[in-house]
Amino acid sequence: SDNVTLFVYDSDGNLVARRTKSGADLQAHKGVNLNLPDGNYSLVAWTNLTDGTEIHDAEQLSKAVLGSAAYYAGDPIIHHENDRVYFATKKITVVQSQFRDEELLFDQAHIPLHVHVTGAAAPATRATAPIEVDIVNLHPQMGFDGASTSALKSVYRAQLAYDAETGDYVARVNAFRFLNDNDIQLKLSNSGGEICYKTVELADFMNEHAISVEDKDEAEIAIRFRFNNTSVEGHRSDTKIGIHAKV
């Protein structure tokens, strides 16, 4: 969805306005018009939200969060990737005698993790794969300050698709923003999870390949699991740039 949802909070952090506009409406009306009393306000905006994301406790800025609908439903393993969410915030001061234009600049609130698996057997049917990849300790929720709720962690199962031309399994999981120092793990197992072939500590992988996701507007990470005759290895993927960032 290209909708933008704007939240306006007063100086006490109370929600005083909420507006949702489509991209077309924003272009046609050149933004969102707000008529606010004199005072100081915090603007928070999110875009690309779908039914897969829920907003909770939006009435108070200090408590407002958004996160995976599957997490809020209590699913122990989340099978749907997070939305490709972008986030913007700004503090403004309103004086009635002035008309002001304020611009919000959006930052990426998610980091795509691209997973490739090479050398695994082809699926017996389109609906079955002999392997599964779990991403462990991903944050299922973010605060309205654009930071993940670090105390909350979930398991996301990558939805692997088989590429008959290359023989690879590929998937993308949109993780909410995390830091270079993290405890995220990628686990490659057989279907059902009884046998774990390989576990990659993402922080170690990022350090080994000089990958940083901090202080960047946009970032993505790609990792390839490769089966050989005796073991499974984890590599920085050549199919996609391992880290791509616009500063």
Predicted regions and their residues:
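Structural motif
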Residues: S1, H116-R126
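A short, Gly/Thr-enriched small/hydrophobic beta-strand-prone motif that recurs across taxa
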Residues: L105-G119
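Structured interaction patches on ligand/partner-binding surfaces of diverse proteins
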Residues: D51-D101, G193-F227
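Hydrophobic, glycine-enriched assembly/anchoring segments
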Residues: D215-V247
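Residues that act as N-cap/strand-start positions at coil-to-secondary-structure junctions
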Residues: A28, Y86, Q98-R100, A109, ...
